[in-house]
């Protein structure tokens, strides 16, 4: 997949990311015990939890380097490897960079940034999903 620009080759990533985007938009809860990237709900299987984001990381093809992207938050520029998939179009996905929450007392580990990027999924070697969470201002 990494060196093949055939759009049909990225379908496994496209399917997973489309599931994540759909879940983030609807926030439905159901009782299923799968614990994978395409688990059919965000967070726990009770209505007492509320999550709106399934954070993801990307690894490049070949050398499996963790992707990082720049962001600016509160006047400080840094890099993050944690993203929120906002949209999927064919073999491309648009992601928002998530920054570590500066409020160390918060239960929510990430905050939203205004940094967005589009990634060609043919350049991705692996996707890793992090625990579901709530991100404000999404």
Residue ranges: model-predicted function:
Residues 1-89, 94-138:
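Short glycine-rich, low-complexity segments
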């Amino acid at each position: 997949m990494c060196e093949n620009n055939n759009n049909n080759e990225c379908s496994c990533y496209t399917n997973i990311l489309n599931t994540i985007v759909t879940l983030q938009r609807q926030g439905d809860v159901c009782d299923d015990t799968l614990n994978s990237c395409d688990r059919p709900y965000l967070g726990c299987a009770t209505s007492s939890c509320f999550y709106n984001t399934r954070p993801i990381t990307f690894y490049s093809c070949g050398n499996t380097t963790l992707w990082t992207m720049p962001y600016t938050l509160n006047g400080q520029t840094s890099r993050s490897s944690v993203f929120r998939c906002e949209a999927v179009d064919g073999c491309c996905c648009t992601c928002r960079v998530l920054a570590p929450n500066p409020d160390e007392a918060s239960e929510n580990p990430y905050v939203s940034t205004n940094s967005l990027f589009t990634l060609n999924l043919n350049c991705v070697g692996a996707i890793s999903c992090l625990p579901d969470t709530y991100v404000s201002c999404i």
